[in-house]
Each structure stands twice: as C-alpha cells, then as structure tokens.
C-alpha cells in the first residue's frame, strides 16, 4: 500500500500533472506531521513514487523516461509532466515570460500546453534553468520535473550513472539517474531542500482542517 496520495492543483484551479517539487514538499509535510518512514511510498497522477528525507534534503524518485524527441534546437520529453527544453547562452537576460509563452501557445503545443525550460550549460557541467509553467502561465522559481527534464537532455555520460547539479531561481537541486545504451533513463532521483514557509488553518464546508506548509 501507499503512505498517501498526492493530488496537485495548478494556480489556475485545475488538477495538474506531476509536480516534482510539490512531491518533495508533501513528503516533507508528511515527515513533519509525524508519519515516520525510512522511505515513503505515495501515489501521484503519473504513478508510484518513492522518497526519503535525510539531513534536511528530500529525495524523490521520478518515473522512468523511455524516449526524448529531439529536433535541431530543442527537445521534448515527459518526466511526469510534458517539457520543452532549449539551450540558451545568456539565461540571466532572457525574457522567459514572453519567450516561454510564445512556445507554450504555439500551434504545436497550445491545445494541451507544455512547460518550457531554458537551460544554460555551465563550464563545470552544471546547469542553470528557468521555466515557464503551463497552468501558472508565468515563470516560476523552480520546477522539479523541468529540472529533471533538463538534466536528462544534458547528460554527461552516454551510458551509466549521471549526476547533474542545477541552479534555479529558488535555489539548488540535484538530479541523478542511469542512462541506458538504448537511450532510456531509469533510477531518476530529484533531490533538494524543502523548507516550511508558514502554518495556517482554514475551514471548508464546516470541516475544520489544519493546513501546514
């Protein structure tokens, strides 16, 4: 069985696809309210996920990725949510909102939408990533499935174990995974901090619910 199920809603109020950082945060929430596990197992819209909490960092196992569609200057893949990944040279000065919005609402993607990630590859092999997210319809501080997508596209080792450090607006993440000879990816783990921002309580339909985040 599962320790819990995660249902994720986008800022537009609609139920969304997998949220990697949301998954890490819900594991931290479960840990903080006393669900004591050496390893968590939970269900999300894209299937089963494993996770653990250690030294203030939450590691989340992502779904396997069986293929990446690559064109001349971008790649498209699904890491639990659909992602468009494009390399750029000067990420800091990029207008992510307008550039991302143009791609998200292009004829190829406007019907179902897509998350758009712009990636700058640093000299040490680490990545800087900025993401325009569908459902939010704006740039966000961090996108876990997007960071994962970028790490898979810009692998270091053609075959075998890879680990990629990623800097996003909200902080730093790490993605580790195994790349197979046939171009598939498995044992994908997204790791980073998850910090409580506030505690509050609210009432819904006369039911008293405590919310902690």
Regions found by a protein language model. Give the residues of each.
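Active-site proximal loop and beta-alpha junction motif in alpha/beta enzyme cores
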Residues: 1-18, 23-142, 149-213
